[in-house]
Structures are given as C-alpha cells and as structure tokens.
C-alpha cells in the first residue's frame, strides 16, 4: 500500500502522497506547525486528523522547542497506521529527527480502536494517538484544542475525512479562537468551514502548492455528553496531595504527582510500604489478552503499553519478555485472533500454543515500592478512620488520633476500599471484594530466559529463588501461608516441572482488591447520595439529553481494585488521576474511562430502577 513514487511517499488506497520529498519538514512547518506562532499559551493542545507518518507531529515538536511554552499535548487520529518497520524505513531519511523518533518508536504500538500515550523530552511532549475512524474518535475522546491539522488526503480521494458529519463535531473539540489548518483549499472544504461557524483565509502554499487554508473559530460549541453521569469532575485548585496507601497504586500516584510539582504526603496503616498485594519478590508485567476490541482486553493492553514506559529505566524491571500459553481452546482462540506486532503467536508449540510478548517484563514489586517509598516521608501506622470537609480541603482522621489536612485526597487502600464506600461514601452498590493470593518460593527449578504464564505462572529466578503462583481465594482473610496452597501452585505448573527436584523455600500471602466486573476502580469519587436524587428516574430518562452532570466529592480521587495485573493498571490509574487533577486530556478512551468509573455499579442499578 505504501511506496515512494516520484516526489512523495505514495498511498495506493487513496492514490495520493503523504508528503513531498522536496523539503518535507519545511512544508510541514509552513502548512501546519507555524500556526503555533499564533498561540500564546504555556500549555498548547494540538489535534490532528490523519497522523500518517507522524511528520506533522515531529515538525510541531521542533516548532514547540523554539517557543517559550512548557508543555505540548498532541492528540492525533489515524485509521490506517504504519507498522513500526515501515516507520523506521521512512525516518532513515530524516536524520534531524532521530533523537525524537528513537524515543517515539520505542513506545509506538498499534492498538485498533484504542488510544496509546507516548511521552517525549522528559514528558514535556505528550502524544495521544487514537487508532480508528475520526467519527469514532469524536465519541471516544474528550478535549479542546488550540489548533487542528486536517490532513487526511484530498477531498476527492478521501471524502469521509471532509464530510458534514466530521465538521458537525469539529467545533466541539476546539477552544475559543482555535485555528484549523488544511493543506487542501478546495471549495468543498471552504464551504464546510463557513457552514459550521468558522471564518477562513487563504495562505500562500509551499513549493508547488499555490495556497492552503486557515480557519478560525471565535467561540467553541458546547458538548453534549451521552452519559453525563460519567462526566469528569471539576477539580478545585490544589497544591498538596494526601495519598492513603503505600502499595504500587499509591506510590505510583505519589511519584507522578510529585514529578508534576505538588507536595505529596503518604499515609500507610502498616509499619512499612508494600505489605499487601504489592509485597511479592517478583511478578509479571503483561496484558490480559482477550479477543481483539473487547473492552477489558483493550484496557489491559493500554495499561500494559503505558506502564512499560514507567518501568523503562527501573533497576527493578527485567524486560525479558513473557510467554503466555493458551492452555485451553478458548485461550488459544484469543491468542490466534490477533494480528499484532505486540506479540508473536506459536500455534504448534508444546505443551500448549503460546504467544511471546517481547516487551513484557518481570518486575520486583517489593523492591520497587521500597525504592519509591524512600523518596517520601511516609507516615506509617496511620490507619484511615474518617474524612471531613473543611475550608480549602479536607481533614482526614486516622485511628492513631492523628489528623492530616490536604486540599486533594487520593485513596489507594487496596482490598479495604469496600468499607470505604459502604461506611464513608454511602454507596452500598459498590462491588469490591478482597481476594487472598499466595505465591510460592521455589529453589531454582528451571533456567528461564523469560517468565511464563500458563495455568499458573513462573518467574525467572531472583537470587536463586523462583516465584510461582498464585492462589485465588475470595473473602479469605487468613494471613498465614498454607502448605496446601504451595501444593496448588506447584500442581498448576506440573506439565513444566514434572520429575524435577522441586523444593519450597518460602511463601508470601497478599490481599488484593477485585471489582465485580474485573475492571479497576479509578477516578473521582462520586457523591452517591446526590446520584440517587438526580438520577432516580434514570430507568426512564437514560436516553434524555437533559440529564444533569455527575456530582462528585470535591477533590477526592481513588485508585483501587487492580487485582492480579496491578503492575500495569496501577501505573495506568496513576496517570489517569493526574490527568483528571490537571484537567488535561486523559490518556485513554471514554469507553475505558467509563468502565473504570467508581460510580458505574450504582449507575447500573439506577438504570434498572433498583435504587430506592
């Protein structure tokens, strides 16, 4: 589909070129990124329909670095993405972009119907890249841009890109006084802008292009949310953050908020960090692979891809790859349906077909948490008791009779979050439970180059110990290790370690929070009492355009119920909370964000008329 022809990179599907080979970067700046000269803002949001090769993005990065702005947030949509190998070939011709491209391509993966986030230049540049149709992107994303680039081939070659339906939505994703640049100056494009409230002017084109278009929108259009009960909160101004819980979820959030410039205090009920589900010697960072485009699978894949960047330079991460075995027909089918560069499927392998996830990693959670904890003055022995609204924030009371004031509070309490919703936030419909998991420490049994997951999982050895696991016992609060559980863990790997000298040298028990639908609980804490009032008729009004927006407990967030894949989702959740707190575009789709929303169980009951 993609070839170099004459003076440009050619796409046979659209019978059109991506860019001219004659000074392509200069052309990109002239046509698109020069619009940044007209934007006087420290935080710039640029959106692009038609990411293509990414050349406009890199041109915008270069332009951004020449300005006094502090952060560039670039949101792009691409329906027909290039593979990694294709992009590497293309960018051999752009030596000036090599430092940016190398950082970009390490994080780039194609995930159809989903969003990936890529960070460059110590997070000064954020790229959110959605793979899919532009109209689907309008449903799945929430942002307003200072500038838009419409670069989806010419109207005659790609009419869907320039349809009335696209322009009907465009103004709802623009800030006041937003600018829109297009390479095409066709009459149909001019008319589309004028019909939708934009003013237009023609600018001189570059090289052989006579003219381009710039459209301006003085006043953006209001958005109508399809599901206003999942509306994001309005976070009040804050400077300090209290995080309750010092496991992976709490410490990841602390790390991100501290890096963003906030004063962070951590309160932990135990005498050290990572005493619960985060306490294992070793664990695996890998996605849950479902059938393609399944919401749960997309969420886990998005979380996995994002978390890799967090762990990239960590001494506690070994990017050794992970084998995921399809131990039954259902799992084999799931693995075989993907056409992805993320993993390679081997159908004829014994004892089971397997996928090799090259960029998966083995993590040492306990050591990771202790290292992160050393960066904070953590208040140990602080077990949460209650929270009270106060002027400018909250007074949080602990069972040791101590109080902490903070203007923003994040709960990351793992499996005890059930009590939080029942006793503090009055949501009796929250589906959260505690699950006991025991892992077993073996003497080094197998000389592994990569960890693997089958009926159970086995890690590479850490200082002569191999971690295998794990049991799953809901509502079992016994903290002592059990020999019978060690036997279960060993039996779950019997097809791999039969006739080997297996010795149990230790065990570890942890308790994890799980939700009723297997998605984590991440987002703003809803005001359940207000929900029950304003949505009491939701059974009949759920399709109405007049429903009120969600009401939240001001400046209270949560990250919980990360289950057995918290090494990925806890990092993902921390980024989501930071996005919400900063009121910036969120790192995932609306579908996934709604699936994580703490109010979702209450909303489902309200929709069915089951709340009195």
Swiss-Prot record:
Q: Which reaction does it catalyse?
A: 5-aminomethyl-2-thiouridine(34) in tRNA + S-adenosyl-L-methionine = 5-methylaminomethyl-2-thiouridine(34) in tRNA + S-adenosyl-L-homocysteine + H(+)
Instruction: Name its co-factor(s).
Output: FAD
The record's region (FAD-dependent cmnm(5)s(2)U34 oxidoreductase) falls at 244-612
Q: Where is this region: tRNA (mnm(5)s(2)U34)-methyltransferase?
A: 1-218
Q: Which GO terms describe its cellular component?
A: cytoplasm
Q: What is its EC number?
A: 2.1.1.61, 1.5.-.-
Among the record's GO biological process terms, what is one?
tRNA processing
Q: Which UniProt keywords apply?
A: Cytoplasm, FAD, Flavoprotein, Methyltransferase, Multifunctional enzyme, Oxidoreductase, S-adenosyl-L-methionine, Transferase, tRNA processing
Biological role stated in the UniProt entry: Catalyzes the last two steps in the biosynthesis of 5-methylaminomethyl-2-thiouridine (mnm(5)s(2)U) at the wobble position (U34) in tRNA. Catalyzes the FAD-dependent demodification of cmnm(5)s(2)U34 to nm(5)s(2)U34, followed by the transfer of a methyl group from S-adenosyl-L-methionine to nm(5)s(2)U34, to form mnm(5)s(2)U34.
The record's comment on protein family reads: In the N-terminal section; belongs to the methyltransferase superfamily. tRNA (mnm(5)s(2)U34)-methyltransferase family.
Task: List the PANTHER family.
Answer: SARCOSINE DEHYDROGENASE-RELATED, TRNA 5-METHYLAMINOMETHYL-2-THIOURIDINE BIOSYNTHESIS BIFUNCTIONAL PROTEIN MNMC
Official protein name in the record = tRNA 5-methylaminomethyl-2-thiouridine biosynthesis bifunctional protein MnmC
